[in-house]
Amino acid sequence: MHLESQAFAEADAGLVGMMGMRGRGMGGMMGGRSNVPNGTPLRVMTLRTRARQGAAFRVPERLSSFDAAWAPRAGAPIRRVPLTFQRMEWLLDGRTFAMGDVAPEETVAAGSTQLWEFENLANPMGMEAAHPIHIHGRQFRVIDRTGGRARNALRAGIVDAGWRDTVLVLPGETVRVQVPFTRHPGLYLYHCHILEHEDMGMMRNFRVT
């Protein structure tokens, strides 16, 4: 836990700055401010229980399994996914989100395995931002990290160990992940998990056929 916390603390250029604005987000760049003062209580929703439900269940003896002998698959196809900022939009592979839109390279065959290479590129505005990239419906393994400013805990592979569904890509970094598309055909999302970035377009569909 300490090492993972250290890794995120070391990523201040990206996570603390969010959009490279040192915590001010797009409001810091635009000069805007929230009209809700910090600490103000907000009613988000009200939940009402209409009937008492039984709570009888058993926890499985084994929740999951882990293959300690796992190794990257040689010869897996590589898909490059640049992470960029243009025209006030965050982009995945040069595209923003469109409902139901799937590019040819975003269509994969069930049972296949691919390497997805996320490259966090500089942009003309000079903004640096970390992107925690989340892939729906799949778990993957981080193969390697190159470029960027070294973060000790990340470089040591501690945070990246094991099966993941989200990977942090720091400014200037290229991170390769191996994704097995083993089952469950359908339409899925992959996106940046920073809400500002996602809402500004950094989300796409992929289809497993």
Annotated model-derived regions:
Residues 1-131, 137-140, 180-187, 191-209:
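Extended terminal and domain-junction accessory segments
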Residues 103-107, 131, 137-185:
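Extracytoplasmic beta-sandwich strand-turn segments characteristic of Greek-key/jelly-roll folds
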